[in-house]
């Protein structure tokens, strides 16, 4: 299901090992009279724990939809939308018109700055530098505005809110409005959507590797259990 959502970004869990129980300390002596130094020691690990979930904002493939309200960001940047009075950011550019003719996301969040399409509009044109223009049947301009793109020093530090929305944190840094096509800021492609950046083949391979590791550990436990049962039976006999 994560392959199909517009603008979905994959994540990877990262782990760290827990504290170790020192059975034999490296560099200590044997204490058997020879005072030999133990070269490596013996530590027993107590497992691992998750430390973070890293979000990857690499670009996904582009799909040509032909819909004039579909906008794909070619390069870095986020659209800004208003969610319950707070600013949020998204790369999912599948916009709609609400009952007032205002550009909104599929969930009704208003694209910033707010742009309302006049009733007489017959065509909507968006240039790569974010200029959106509503035209009438005669080709005359009815309304226009600029759609800004925002970048972050550390986009991986954004907080995911679901529905392909993100909010700023102390780790992400503040949103910076950029100039389209300059300083690594992307441009806007009308009639296209950015799809998920999840690679099906890679995820299938990773799943198979994880499954094989699980099966190996399971068989090791079964073998150890069988050996323990055999030892108990031999002791009884």
Language-model features, listed with the residues they occupy:
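Amphipathic alpha-helical polymerization modules
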Residues: 1-237
